[in-house]
Amino acid sequence: MAGSKSYTIVEYFGGGDGYRCGYCKNDKGNLSHGMWSHTMTVQDYQDLIDRGWRRSGKYVYKPIMNKTCCPQYTIRCHALKFQPSKSHKKILKKMSKFISKGELPKGQSDGKLLVSLYGLTVHPQSQNITTTDKEGMERGKWGEIDCPTQKTQNPFFFWGPGMGADPSRAPCRKAKDLRKERRLQKEQMRQHAEGVSSIVSPTPPQMTQPKGLEDFINQSLPENAAHSLEVRLVPVDFEDPQFTASYQQSVELYARYQMAIHGDDPSECSESEFRRFLCDSPLEAESSPDGPEMGYGSFHQQYWLDGRIVAVGVIDVLPNCVSSVYLYYHPDFASLSLGSYSALREIAFTRQLQKQSPKLCYYYLGFYIHSCPKMRYKGQYRPSDLLCPETYMWVPIERCIPQLEDSRYARLNQDPDAGDCRALKEVGRALVLHRRAVMPYAAYARKRRGSSDETEVQQYASLVGQDCAERILLYRA
């Protein structure tokens, strides 16, 4: 990286005490190692997440995989090879239809009628967002329809939407098949008129390239589109004018999301909590000649609908990847599948950055938890890999699923001879920060008075690996 030498400075907290698991609700089943990061380089964080670490604000933690109740496997998607599935295309088309025509999907599982953005009022001074009363938003259930037993004999029975195929009509055919048939008929008529045999061999169908992710995202909209959607990338920096100008609106959106989607109390989603969780990042903003134009670091990717923020994706841009941290959005737009839509946009963003920085070609989705069905959606962004918790090698998810079906914890790399190539070899070479002086742990240990802390330092260094141990400064009092 360009610029003066920067160091990562951490305080290691160890691990072993169980905490309540947010996935299976086990009171003390969540076990992890943790450390507080005062500052961190993007390269060090890249290497740490490639060893199973993950940050929440400035706290960096690593699940104790063979002991924790819900093992969490780091997952990454090969962004350059990604092709949207049918469900992904449906989500992209749904958003495009909403932007073009202003139609919100109905019939969602939450059973609520979603209000439009125009039901919101943003006061210029306080920026407090209010919405229409929720009374009357509950959708009434459809009345039961008594279908006659002899449908074709009832002259007053009309087939309607949602009632299946109309038996009185011929089966539907694909539009492209009908167009192909009409073209063939015209060609036969033309050749017959010219005295050529009307029996014409149909031209072999040309292989069409399937629409890619960017084709759906960049689809042209009508001039009179009902809405306008703009995606802005804002650095997490309180000295950045765009970040500070939108900060209060982001805070309020976060609180609304947490209370509606996760059932938090107002005290649990305060401004200070928002700042600690989604704004306080240990990552130092960095730039590099072969890196992306906006540099590396932590960013908020804001989705502005008609001039107001409706969703924010918190991401870290690292040397080899875009790492998804969190997403929050306006609950009234839940039917637009904003979680999946933002992930698709972030994959496209990764591909865009790769054109500027060739090494930056992966999209990290955080942790994959196979034992938690709600988290399995992350495995739908293919091709993707899971990180082996013992060798720290990447394994295609298709090879991992059968193992995880048999056991919550698994050594995903099935090569018995494979090992951790960055395993700790010499703890004495780990760097420590003691009384503002940087020194190898071996030198510090010779000076240290009192009981030995070698067991703790050995554990820390083995978890971060030899390379990181020789770069990261472990604070020693």
Indicate residue ranges for each PLM-predicted region:
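Aromatic (often tryptophan-rich) hydrophobic motifs at membrane interfaces
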Residues: Q302-D385
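Eukaryote-specific, cytoplasm-facing alpha-helical/coiled-coil scaffolding segments in long proteins
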Residues: Y73-I75, D280-P282, P402-S407
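Alpha-helical interaction elements in eukaryotic regulators
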Residues: M40-D44, S246, S250, S270, ...
